[in-house]
Amino acid sequence: LNGEEGETYRSSERYREEIPKPFVLPEKNENMRRVYAYLMKARCIDHRIITSFVKKDMIYEDKKYHNVVFVGYNPVGMPRHVHKRGTYTKGEPFKGTVDGSDPHYSFHYAGGDNIVYVFEAPIDMLSFISLYQEDWEKHNYVALCGVAEHALMQILKDNPNIKRIAHTGLYLTSRNCGGMESIGQRFRESLLDTGNKENGS
């Protein structure tokens, strides 16, 4: 579609049913002109925020389709998840997850303080940071790349310093408004089951 290609979100049920496929990072393009143009002009994300994540090797442009590539890492710095977002602005945008990605390590940033902001998609996370830039690198953020709670539960496990969960980012930026009540309820149930953090909504 408009030169974009990939696969759409897959449910957690499908992750369990499918035979695991090898995880391979998409090949990088030699420049990031289309990614910067799309994120800055179409999504109004601050250049400094984009560059910060680029320097962390968390955002780049793929060579084949010029999608934005969002990379999620595990605690030892190994890439474990890739979400791709098309840069074409006409028609239905492509969004997809690379085969073999571990949903526990979707696009996220751990800054070390005691609150985590939760979002549905990486674009929403970057938009929020662009709006609230003061001391942003001290905070924690996670993009679920869908609506399952795997990545939220993982960032809480890996960062015991986090005591509060801010649902506001998820509620304000989600495109799937009809599912927010059930998602919030599922988070609360998961946290109760694990004896984990307070809600900071």
Protein language model features and the residues they cover:
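Glycine-centered flexibility motif
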Residues: 56-57, 96-103, 177-184, 188
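Short, Lys/Arg-enriched charge-dense amphipathic segments
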Residues: 14-24, 28-30, 34-35, 70-84, ...
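Detector for Asparagine
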Residues: 2, 29-31, 67, 74, ...
